[in-house]
Structures are given as structure tokens and as C-alpha cells.
């Protein structure tokens, strides 16, 4: 039977690329989304048509424990337990510090960190019982260095996700491997549509390979980390940023 992969925030961007790549490799896929319903269902249809694996789409706010409980109940009834968890769901409410309020700060942490906590807690028992599990947390180079102003809540959440990775790896060893990927500037829909051409040009100049990353390149790294070939990789943060230069 195929291993089951849950990707939070899996309908667009990096999450979509991961869903497509792992579906191509023969994994059964669960696409979690919150608002991107059309994109999620279109992605599901593509995966089933092209790769012949089982695929579910489930709307759930991963920051809410009750909705995560319902999501996992549905997964277990349809596919069984989750063998591989990709904590990818994230929001970015960028603003200057003096214009930001505590509710915005809290919301970012709730989705980006508490969401990963909630999903990791739900997969733990199944993974432990079968003596196998893989958890990949999608952080950011912003969780390691500060590259931009106005990102205090996002950066703090991504740094917390790195810390969560290390703590879970210690507690979940030896059977459950927990690793973290820290992408730099990746050419997702949000990134390319959200900035003007001049800003994108300036960002590329800060990258040693002189281009921004493709979501597929993050997906290729995920594919490796969940494979048997990566069995000796655990409790690790891997940057995928083309050699990002400088920080604030």
C-alpha cells in the first residue's frame, strides 16, 4: 500500500509543487487548504489523472485544533494514517512594527507554528506505533537571518518552526525523522504577483546563482528527504536559497 502524505497549505506554490512531485513518485496525497478551494480541486484532479494515486482535498484551518481533529478523522477513514507530514501552511501579514497589532502577530504564529504543532501531534501516535514517520517543516531563510523589514511576525514564526523541528526530532527519535527546509526567494504565484519588476530584479542580484528558485526545486528536496536514501538525515535544517547574500 502507498504511503500517505499530508501537505498543509498544499493547493498553491511550494505545497502544490510538493503534492505533484510526491504524487508522481506514487505516494497517496492529502491536500489541505483553507481558502484555495478551486486550486485544490484542480490539483487533485491532475494528480489522480496523471499519476493514478489516491488523493483527497480537505479544507481546514490548521491553527484550530478542532478542525485538525476533523481533518485527521476523515483521512483515517479514507486512507488510513498519515505516514509523511509536510507542515507547509503559512501566512505573511507584513507591515511596519509600529503599525502592527498583537492580533496580527498572534494570527501569524497560530497558523505558521501552532498549525505545525497541531498536525505533528496528530501524526505522532500512528507513526510511533508503526515505527516509521517523516515530518518536514517548511520554514524560511527569514527564520535564520533577517533580510527585509516589516516581517517581524513572519520571521519570528519561521524561527520558531526551526526550534520546533529540533525539539520534535529529539522527542520522536528514533523512528520518526523530523527535518526542516528553509527556502529563500522562490518564484511562487504570491511572490511573483506580489512585487514589481524592479524589486524582483534587485532580489535576484542578491542571489549568487543570479535567479530565484522554482517551487519544483523545493519539492525535489522534499522527495529526497522522505526517501529511504535520506534515512540518516534527521534534526537538520537545509537552506535552499541559491546562495542568498546579506541580511539586515
What are these regions (language model features)?
Residues 96-109, 135, 191, 199, ...:
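Substrate-binding pocket helix/loop in short-chain dehydrogenase/reductase
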Residues 145, 223, 234-248:
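Short C-terminal tail/terminal secondary-structure segment
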Residues 125, 166-174, 231:
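Alpha-helical segment proximal to the catalytic Tyr-Lys
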Residues 207-218, 229:
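A conserved structural motif in NAD(P)-dependent oxidoreductases
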Residues 120, 157, 165:
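Active-site helix of classical SDR
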Amino acid at each position: 500500500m502507498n504511503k500517505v502524505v499530508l501537505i498543509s497549505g498544499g493547493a498553491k506554490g511550494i505545497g502544490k509543487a510538493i503534492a505533484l512531485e510526491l504524487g508522481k513518485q506514487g505516494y497517496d496525497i492529502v491536500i489541505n487548504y483553507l481558502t484555495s478551494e478551486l486550486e485544490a480541486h484542480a490539483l487533485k484532479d491532475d494528480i489522480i489523472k496523471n499519476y493514478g494515486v489516491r488523493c483527497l482535498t480537505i479544507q481546514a484551518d490548521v491553527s484550530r485544533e478542532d478542525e485538525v481533529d476533523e481533518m485527521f478523522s476523515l483521512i483515517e477513514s479514507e486512507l488510513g494514517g498519515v505516514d509523511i507530514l509536510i507542515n507547509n501552511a503559512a501566512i505573511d501579514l507584513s507591515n511596519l512594527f509600529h503599525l502592527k497589532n498583537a492580533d496580527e502577530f498572534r494570527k501569524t504564529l497560530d497558523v505558521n507554528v501552532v498549525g505545525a504543532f497541531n498536525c505533528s501531534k496528530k501524526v505522532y501516535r500512528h507513526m510511533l506505533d508503526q515505527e516509521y514517520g517523516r515530518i518536514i517543516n517548511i520554514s524560511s531563510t527569514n527564520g535564520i537571518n533577517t533580510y527585509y523589514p516589516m516581517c517581524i511576525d513572519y520571521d519570528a514564526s519561521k524561527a520558531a518552526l526551526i526550534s520546533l523541528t529540533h525539539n520534535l526530532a529529539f522527542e520522536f527519535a528514533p523512528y520518526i525523522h523530523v527535518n526542516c527546509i528553509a527556502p529563500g526567494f522562490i518564484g511562487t504565484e504570491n511572490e511573483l504577483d506580489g512585487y514589481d519588476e524592479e524589486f524582483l530584479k534587485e532580489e535576484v542580484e542578491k542571489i549568487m546563482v543570479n535567479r530565484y528558485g522554482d517551487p519544483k526545486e523545493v519539492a525535489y528536496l522534499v522527495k529526497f528527504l522522505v526517501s529511504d536514501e535520506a534515512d540518516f538525515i534527521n534534526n537538520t535544517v537545509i537552506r535552499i536559497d541559491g546562495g542568498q547574500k546579506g541580511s539586515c
